[in-house]
């Protein structure tokens, strides 16, 4: 049975850590203290603290653009900042490239498409915006404004290899979006949770489309699209399973690893890892209670590093904890 071992606890922020993202050896963090910090995952040392005057309120979400040293950060001040680095050796400074405006209320989540062509943002104003980015990450043109959620949109995530976007909302649903005839349209509405859906993540698989979601109702659910076609419109989605009950309070973040494991964290301070032991049947293979002592955990992300299976969590204690999943 695997166990989760705490590798490092980094006290990076003076207020809750909302978001983490990892790319090209750099871990980015965003916090209620308005700060964005960059950490070298090879030694877990702080590389840089970005200019905290860029945002007037909390930084709720950070996301690296694929294949380049560009970071997007969404804030409660309604804006999204874009930052760029010129080097891979972490010696240079990160510069502010652009500030994106458009949302009327707090930006809750930002996410890049797998090819880096699109940046999606969502907000308490109930909308999801899709932006086309130029190669330099300095110009952003609004491609679509999606307004079909009836409440606050909490989180967005792109599929790892398809132009599919999932948005999670206070209206208790997940919506799946895809491009059709040069417009972005809602391809499916996933209903079944009994409370706010805080998060979701797509399976990283070459065939089939599955999504996990976490909710205020304390459950993590798996959804499956009954097609493997590129065209997902007019295709049925089913709730494939509900993962074994672990959480006693809201599930704030889920992450689906490249080798098929799912991690979840939430308001109860629990970090859990699940494995599919046969098609549609999952087991809890590792669990840590009070993973950030008495504090809530807001985010979890998988990190593959030198053959090690690591997890990164961020909590209300301002800490970023790094965990290793080890076979005992």
Swiss-Prot record:
InterPro entries per UniProt: CIAO1/Cia1, G-protein_beta_WD-40_rep, WD40/YVTN_repeat-like_dom_sf, WD40_repeat_CS, WD40_repeat_dom_sf, WD40_rpt
Gene Ontology CC terms: cytosolic [4Fe-4S] assembly targeting complex; nucleus
This protein's record includes keyword Cytoplasm: yes
PROSITE patterns assigned to the protein according to its UniProt record, in alphabetical order: WD_REPEATS_1 (PS00678), WD_REPEATS_2 (PS50082), WD_REPEATS_REGION (PS50294)
GO biological process: iron-sulfur cluster assembly; tRNA wobble uridine modification
Keywords: Cytoplasm, Nucleus, Repeat, WD repeat
Entries under Pfam families matching the protein: WD40 (PF00400)
WD repeats: 12-49, 54-93, 102-141, 148-187, 192-233, 246-284, 291-328
Principal cellular location given in the protein's record: cytoplasm
Keyword check for Repeat: yes
Cellular compartment(s): Cytoplasm; Nucleus
PANTHER family with a match to the protein in the record: CYTOSOLIC IRON-SULFUR PROTEIN ASSEMBLY PROTEIN CIAO1-RELATED, WD40 PROTEIN CIAO1
Function: Essential component of the cytosolic iron-sulfur (Fe/S) protein assembly machinery. Required for the maturation of extramitochondrial Fe/S proteins.
Family: Belongs to the WD repeat CIA1 family.
Subunit structure, interactors included: Interacts with NAR1.
Protein name according to UniProt: Probable cytosolic iron-sulfur protein assembly protein 1
Highest classification ranks of the organism: Eukaryota, Fungi, Dikarya, Ascomycota, Saccharomycotina
Gene name per UniProt: CIA1
């Amino acid at each position: 049975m695997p166990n989760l071992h705490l590798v490092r606890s980094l006290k990076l922020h003076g207020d809750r850590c909302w978001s983490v993202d990892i790319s090209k050896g750099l871990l980015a963090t965003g916090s209620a203290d308005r700060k964005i910090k960059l950490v070298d995952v090879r030694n877990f040392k702080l590389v840089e603290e970005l200019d905290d005057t860029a945002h007037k309120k909390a930084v709720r979400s950070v996301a690296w653009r694929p294949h380049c040293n560009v970071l997007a950060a969404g804030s409660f001040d309604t804006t999204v900042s874009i930052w760029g680095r010129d080097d891979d050796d972490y010696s240079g400074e990160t510069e502010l490239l652009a500030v994106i405006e458009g949302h009327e209320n707090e930006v809750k989540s930002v996410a890049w498409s797998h090819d880096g062509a699109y940046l999606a943002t969502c907000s308490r104003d109930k909308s999801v915006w899709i932006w086309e980015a130029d190669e330099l990450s300095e110009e952003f043109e609004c491609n679509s404004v999606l307004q079909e959620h009836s409440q606050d949109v909490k989180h967005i995530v792109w599929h790892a290899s398809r132009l599919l976007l999932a948005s999670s909302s206070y209206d208790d649903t997940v919506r799946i979006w895809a491009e059709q005839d040069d417009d972005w349209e809602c391809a499916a509405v996933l209903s079944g949770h009994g409370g706010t859906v805080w998060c979701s993540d797509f399976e990283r698989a070459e065939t089939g489309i599955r999504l996990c979601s976490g909710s205020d109702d304390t459950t993590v659910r798996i959804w499956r699209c009954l097609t493997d076609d590129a065209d997902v419109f007019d295709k049925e989605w089913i709730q494939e399973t509900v993962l074994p009950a672990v959480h006693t309070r809201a599930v704030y973040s889920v992450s689906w690893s490249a080798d098929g494991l799912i991690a979840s964290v939430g308001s109860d301070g629990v970090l859990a890892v699940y494995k599919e032991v046969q098609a549609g049947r999952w087991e809890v293979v590792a669990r840590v209670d009070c993973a950030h002592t008495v504090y809530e955990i807001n985010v979890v992300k998988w990190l593959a590093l030198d053959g090690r299976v690591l997890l990164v969590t961020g909590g209300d204690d301002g800490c970023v904890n790094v965990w290793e999943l080890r076979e005992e």
